[in-house]
Amino acid sequence: MSEVKVNKISPRSGTDVTLGDSGDTFDVPSGATLDVTGATVTGLAGLPTWQSVTTGATLTAVAGRGYPIDTTSNACTVTLPASASVGDVIVFTDYARKFAVNALTINQNSLNYQGNSSPNPVYDTKGETVCIVYMDATKGWIPTNDGAVANEVPQTYSADMLIVGGGGGCSGGEYGGGGGAGGFRTSTQTLTEDLVYTVTVGDGGAGVSSSSQKGGSGSISSISGTGLTTITSAGGGGGGAYDHPADTNRDGADGGSGGGGGGHDTAPGAGGSGNTPSTSPSQGNDGGDGQSGTPYQGAGGGGAGAVGADGSGTGNGGNGSASTVTGSSVTYAGGGGGSGSGVVGSGGTGGGGDATLTGDGDNGTVNLGGGGGATQGDDGGSGGKGVVILNVPDAYYSGAVTGSPTVTTGQGAGSDETVIKFTGDGTYTA
């Protein structure tokens, strides 16, 4: 065997050097090193030529190429070549880490895939990279790698949150206090990718038919998860009752905001305490005190933004507080109005129910956490159910939710925020 020893091969003209002819084999002996540091190498078997990022719903793949695929906006179906040679390699990678939201489907295009002609393979794991090699007609394309690649450093992003408890209900019959609004709390916290955050949405308290029974208090709303400071908003306190001749149910109940006290000729009820349990900033306000004498009047339930009015005044429910977590200003957690003979209180802004002279009191607004309105007629109004809302950057929204929340993208001043509105219990995986 002839041997040629040189330190450098340079072209006699131009910039290309050709080694041998088609079909020739060049062996690199065991232990030798082929150093291509700093060079651009193309066309070597097993090394794909990487293409620009694919964002479309379909792609026709070519052997020897690598494809970064972005499924942020839509799923993608890749059609493999109709014919292939042994050793052909194609690579697909989850460019935006969104395969779990919008999957990659591979159309086999008549060739086998792992020895099967159907069904088409689907890759739906976040961060997945799929490298396939064509082996032969029997097995066809074989994945040499189809695993997920975890981030070496946990990825985090900021989320704005609104948590509103369920509003309180009211007594029935006459002179009842309005229901207190559910607690109103906001928070901005850091979420970590792949961790699960659990949401509970509180129901409104029940309105009752008896004038000797105070309305039911609302239930708590909360969000919790690993590394998260749990935020809990209390349910609104139930409105106090006329409760004649006894006096055990005249006071409004404590809660996120307190229920209004019931009216009575000699011993009216006191308003329930808001911000119970205590939080900073305060999650709500006190209910008003009922009025004695003629005409006796139930007081308004407390709202997130104001105390309920006393029965000696208007008996109106306290106004709620506004939040822009959805991208626009919405007012939540208004207190319910108290009832009296000839005069009834209005519900506070933010879903508080109005009191009525006849029929049933108005219910607090669902998913605003408003307190129910009292009545001089039949059943007291029920409190409105609470709500939990998350606002995260569009670019980081994972799409992994349970409990059927309403999800709206492209919100906020920059049209780049995703709003996740939970109207019932559920989870969000970041």
Predicted regions and their residues:
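Glycine-rich, low-complexity segments
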Residues: 1, 25-63, 138-158, 283, ...
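Short hydrophobic/aromatic-rich beta-strand motifs
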Residues: 63-71, 85-97, 105, 118-134, ...
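Beta-strand-rich receptor-binding modules of extracellular spikes/adhesins
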Residues: 2-40, 128, 136-153, 311, ...
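Exposed extracellular interaction/assembly regions and N-terminal maturation sites
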Residues: 31-33, 39-107
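Disulfide-stabilized cysteine-rich extracellular repeat microdomains
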Residues: 9, 14, 22-24, 31-33, ...
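Extracellular beta-strand solenoids
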Residues: 6, 11, 19, 28, ...
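Low-complexity, glycine/proline-biased repetitive segments and flexible coils/loops
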Residues: 154-430
